[in-house]
Amino acid sequence: MMNICSTFTLLFRLGIFMRLNKYIASCGVCSRREADKLIDEGRVTINGEKAVFGVDVTDTDSVFVDGKKIEPSDEKIVIAYYKPVGVTCTEKDKYAEKTVIEDLGFDKRVTYAGRLDKDSEGLLLMSNDGELINAMMKGSMKHEKEYEVTVDTDVTGDFLKAMSSGMYLKELDRRTRACEVKKTGKRSFNIILTQGLNRQIRRMCAALGANVVKLKRIRVMNVKLKDYDLKPGKYVVLSEQVVKKLYKDAGIAR
């Protein structure tokens, strides 16, 4: 059976119109949401003209992002990358000391599913399949992400209860979902999130008077960092068996 990614590519090459943000995602540049941001920032051109929201493209169009031509690929890969502390999750940032793309040094254009802030480390799943990235980032799907956290105060029963039951974050005007939290040490705990609010764990801890000393993502959906002998800054291409389950859990045919 032809997978959905190959189907998109085939239809596109047969001259079927595709929405620009979807096309950018299918080329592995970024998610659709990030593609909209690129368009808004004027970093996308079609046939030499600055792109606008809502336009469609076909295989006869030349699409460039940041001056580089992009094209869809039939070969879709997923990699597990150990992001080190100090590396910034962004495609391009002139102020960043080092971005994930620069640190990764992969020979295909890939993007990530779910940011880790500069001061955090751990597992990033990266792919050139924008449809997979988009599906993995959908909050409504409640995909699990697990973290090891160390704070500068004792982890009490009240702390665990507040973290797990959900809390209102004033600065985001959002309430966190109830989640699983397990104490692992006097000042450490593991937490499993099913949403990805900006700096969520750090904000939750701060609301309870604790500062995060160390934050490490150890699992994304069915992919566990401990299953791979990865050092910070290193990556591994995931096996077909692991990727197949990842697509299934993300709700994408493969």
Question: What positions do the PLM features span?
Answer:
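Basic, flexible Lys/Arg- and Gly-enriched helix-loop patches that mediate nucleic-acid binding at interfaces
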Residues: 14-254
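Methionine residue identity
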Residues: 1-2
